[in-house]
């Protein structure tokens, strides 16, 4: 099963806790975050986990967003430079003998996409931006995570121009599956599918039809 071990296996007393992502981003050191991800993966694995919901690849554009600290930077280039390092630290490098080996767990690139760009920084809000801005500001980290072989992607609670990401087929299927050729697993966030019009937490055909594999 999976859990939020984002900056260390913080769910277990005695595990190693590292600075949160905003602090790690200030270090401007991909090699450091790779090593941190390796430790996090190992301590997650020995506590019985197979999957961590990390890395967070948000690109916060408004400091009023209450989850700004979860992003590495407001600069998409910095976020992109960290994405592959964290994914490879968690899972290992594709083709290497230890890829998804006994010291590794599955990574999850989250929260797709634009959660750091919502109007007025509102949590679970609406990113009222153009397709070009969504692509150029908020997506580069995901592209690098895909190149590094990330096995899962988590959809965001937020919306893009009024459409909830959990029900946005043009993004979940059109971009992730068709454009980026991702053949891994797309997972929902905590009952976020229930916010799609016509859905409940218990039932949401629209999310599955949009491309979500599990909610």
Explain the meaning of each model-derived region.
Residues 1-215:
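Glycoside hydrolase catalytic-domain context in secreted enzymes
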